[in-house]
From Swiss-Prot:
The lineage of its organism: Bacteria, Pseudomonadati, Pseudomonadota, Gammaproteobacteria, Pseudomonadales. It holds the Pfam family Aminotran_3. Belongs to the class-III pyridoxal-phosphate-dependent aminotransferase family. CDD domains: OAT_like. It catalyses: L-2-aminoadipate + 2-oxoglutarate = 2-oxoadipate + L-glutamate; 5-aminopentanoate + 2-oxoglutarate = 5-oxopentanoate + L-glutamate. Pyridoxal 5'-phosphate binds at residues 102-103, 233, 288. The keyword Transferase applies. It comes from the Bacteria. Catalyzes the conversion of 2-aminoadipate (2AA) to 2-oxoadipate (2OA). Is most active on L-2-aminoadipate (L-2AA) and shows only weak activity on the enantiomer, D-2-aminoadipate (D-2AA). Shows moderate activity on 5-aminovalerate (5AVA) and weak activity toward 4-aminobutyrate (GABA). Is involved in a D-lysine catabolic pathway. Induction: Up-regulated when grown on L-lysine, D-lysine or 2-aminoadipate. This is 2-aminoadipate transaminase.
């Protein structure tokens, strides 16, 4: 693979060149087939080249390929926002805007939060990931490699421990850390918003403690602080339902969307309480390419397939296959390096750990390389890159899913 014209600051996980894909399978330019457990890093919940999405893209490309919504509205943008207002399960009137990416959605949410509250400080969480733009870098709960050598970042942003059964941080410990933050470093009246993922993606598929989310919601409601929930990776069926936040027992004030919203086309959104989305002056939100007609058409075709029944069926099938395999591997002692199973629904991660519980990223790397040689693509996550995240399309055929898990099992067995 010739990379001479590619920035060497871009890290490439798999040194192959892809040619085409179908549902949960891709082929490289040499004709080698791979089962895809990466899914474009969570973008392809409905699979590669989903027929309905492709048809929608082709049809829209013959009608209108671009028009800046700020200059003149177009039908696909309007239709998609109407669909999203019905698809997002909240109790309040919802409004929003479309963006080109998840990071851009996060950036705009920060603007809205500051504009609506008149406050500046944002509180994020250890292990979180919200994008690669300058402002979203500061939200990320990890320095290397994202924040290295880029200098001062927009703020102020503060970080708290992420309470989860997967991190070992309890609700009580996180609340104590929050109390300390407000007594030592930051005046609570300066806080505009908290931002978090209900299930951390880059962090290793770690699920937030619902008790903490509910305590935080009460805390914010009493003080006029907003909650921004990032469902960029966990949304659109990944956890077996439309979004992951309902399992927390709270509603967000602002919600970030992207990845599987549009079947592989670049699109994001920030949606939330209608009064918040009107807090900035006219012209305060927008973008030349935001809500491109072709991306909107792809999103409409995607949402049409994401019925509650479909999402539950797809998610349960994949969850059962992964969990049953994992339990069998642990019970049989397949490999001493198999640690915890993280995540929710079909959003699952497998931790690699040494006997003393410390991360084992080198062993994960060996499994990824061996799996690729056998025709399975995997993706690492976690602070130490020691958790494999399983992101196969939800629409993967049962036999292809089992074939992929068979390959993973063979590679795990070789670690012995």
């Amino acid at each position: 693979m010739n990379q001479e014209s590619i920035s060497q600051s871009i890290a490439i996980v798999h040194p192959i060149t892809l040619s085409h894909g179908r549902n949960a399978e891709v082929w490289d330019t040499d004709g080698k087939r791979y089962i895809d457990f990466v899914g474009g890093i969570g973008v392809l919940n409905l699979g590669h080249c989903n027929p309905a999405v492709v048809e929608a893209i082709q049809a829209q490309a013959t009608r209108l390929t671009h028009y800046a919504f700020n200059a003149a509205p177009h039908g696909p943008y309007l239709a998609l926002m109407e669909q999203l207002s019905q698809f997002v399960p909240v109790s309040y009137p919802l409004a929003g805007m479309l963006t080109n990416s998840g990071a851009e959605a996060a950036e705009n949410a920060l603007k809205v939060a500051r504009g609506a509250t008149g406050k500046r400080a944002i509180i994020a969480f250890d292990g979180g990931f919200h994008g690669r733009t300058l402002a979203t870098l500061n939200l990320n709960g990890k320095v290397a490699p994202y924040k290295q050598r880029v200098g001062e970042l927009p703020g102020p942003v503060y970080h708290l421990p992420y309470p989860s059964a997967d991190t070992g941080v309890t609700c009580e410990q996180a609340l104590k850390a929050m109390d300390r933050l407000f007594s030592v470093e930051l005046a609570v009246e300066d806080v505009a918003a908290f931002i978090f993922e209900p299930v951390q993606g880059e962090g290793g598929f770690l699920a937030l403690d619902p008790a903490f989310a509910q305590a935080l919601r009460r805390f914010c409601d009493e003080r006029g602080i907003l909650i921004i929930i990032d469902e960029i990776q966990s949304g659109f069926g990944r956890t077996g339902q439309r979004f992951a936040f309902p399992r927390l027992g709270i509603e967000p004030d602002l919600l970030l969307l992207a990845k599987s919203i549009a079947g592989g086309m670049p699109l994001g959104a920030v949606v939330g309480r209608k009064e918040l989305m009107a807090a900035l002056p006219k012209g305060g939100l927008g973008g030349t390419y935001s809500g491109n007609p072709i991306s909107c058409a792809a999103a409409l075709a995607s949402l049409a397939q994401m019925t509650d029944e479909n999402l539950a069926t797809w998610g349960e099938r994949q969850e059962q296959a992964i969990v049953s395999r994992y339990e069998r591997w642990k019970a049989s002692g397949l490999s001493p390096y198999i640690g915890r199973l993280t995540g929710v629904g079909a959003m699952r991660g497998i931790e690699f750990a040494n006997a003393d519980g410390s991360p084992a990223p080198a062993q994960l790397a060996k499994v990824m390389e061996a799996a690729r040689a056998r025709g399975l693509l995997l993706m690492p996550s976690g602070k130490a890159r020691h958790i494999i995240r399983l992101l196969a399309p939800l629409t993967i055929e049962a036999e292809v899913l089992e074939e992929g898990l068979d390959i993973l099992e063979q590679c795990l067995a070789e670690l012995n």
